[in-house]
Amino acid sequence: MTGYTLTCPVCNKEFSDSYTLTCPGGCQGLIRAKYAARQITLHDAPGVFKYMDWLPVTGVLRTRAEPVCFKSEGLARALGLSDLWIVFSGYWPEVGAFAVSGSFKEFEAFPTMQRLSERTKGIIQVSSAGNTGRAFAEVSAETCQPVIIVVPESARDRLFTTSPAHDTLLITISGDYTDAINLGSRICTLPGIFPEGGAKNVARRDGMGTVMLAGTLAMGTLPDWYLQAVGSGTGGIAAYEASLRLIADGRFGTRMPRLLLFQNEPFIPMVRAWQEKRREIKDEDMPDAEQAISQVYSDVLTNRTPPYGIVGGVFDTLIATNGLMAGVSSADAQEAGKLFSSSEGIDPDPAAAVCVAGLMRAVRSGVIKPDEKILLNITGGGYARGRKDLPRFVKAPDIMVSKETPFEKISAKVQEWMRYYA
């Protein structure tokens, strides 16, 4: 098992990991993992941990969840593409996809929980619009590791697992994803609770980066294009960082893939900022944010505070990859989802349908050429099949609050629950 250190992209200092989320020197940038293994070797390890050369862990958890890549036939034929590859993250046994939560967020959750257990003692807190929370609840249910999850009240039904999540404390808040993030941040001020960290967590980014690893290893070379629908944009950052490692590996080509990232109209703050080549997201990039969020097809793509302008964030990633961003309408996403289901034989997550719609537009407009090598990240799917095959336990909220609930009341309930894990 190879080791790693952490590095800061601002001051370039190297330091050891103690579940570190930021530069010890106070720099404002996304720290990265620097792995001892320059070339990746696949390990005989469960699921996503086969890529542990480039994951910030030394041990593994039992899982079958990993990204599965294959060359498209049905969708490629429908769009007139000769070299379209799909990385599928979700539940689809026929192709070997066993992310039972239905989302690529499992690829983040497993290494994040393992990293926490190896590097510190405490309980992890996750704020989510649904998919991330469900993935962490699934890992908790499988490993008995405690986790505190905060989601908007509208997402409570998305918190289901394949075995009872006895060690998950689920808090719902009336509001949206940003309200869940804000409450989660306050909960993390309590002793013994650690934020999962979002884009700042190298385990989350490098877990997501396994999508690019799986795709490149299946294709034998880096793609010309990498496509994904994004809310925070962390998946795009992860794809770029994985590509840097694959180029340094020396066996998969030297040309950086171009990133094409999509947001769901009408909530497209990063698209607006990027079109003007601004590092900062302004209030006018998300006018009437709550109304816009209520109109999207995929509300997991609605982060109001994405890691866009931070050093090493989405803006820098798009600059480094000569990348593009575009908005996709909900109507186009729904039609694209139907096309994907009929042509490939599995239902995509709404966010993945947004990505398919973006691909269709890019092909029609000539941005993507028919013979280019395309890696399409289907970030979730197989829910219909999962409902048939898998046990389902919907996690009932343990604490239900509004934005007006005094934090002292919430804090007391959280600390009472934590006593079971002291």
UniProtKB/Swiss-Prot annotation:
SUPFAM superfamilies named in the record: Tryptophan synthase beta subunit-like PLP-dependent enzymes
Keyword Ligase: no
Positions with a binding annotation for pyridoxal 5'-phosphate: 131, 379
Gene3D superfamilies xrefs: 3.40.50.1100
Domain of life: Archaea
GO BP, sorted A to Z: coenzyme M biosynthetic process
Transferase recorded as keyword: yes
Keywords associated with the record: Coenzyme M biosynthesis, Pyridoxal phosphate, Transferase
Ranges in coiled-coil conformation: none
Enzyme class: transferase
Catalytic activity, reaction form: O-phospho-L-serine + sulfite + H(+) = L-cysteate + phosphate
InterPro entries assigned to the protein according to its UniProt record, in alphabetical order: Cysteate_synthase, TrpB-like_PALP, TrpB-like_PALP_sf
Residues annotated as signal peptide: none
EC code(s) of this entry: 2.5.1.76
PTM-bearing positions, type N6-(pyridoxal phosphate)lysine: 105
A molecular function GO annotation: pyridoxal phosphate binding
Quaternary structure and interacting proteins, as annotated: Homotrimer.
Family affiliation: Belongs to the threonine synthase family. Cysteate synthase subfamily.
Name of the protein in its database record: Cysteate synthase
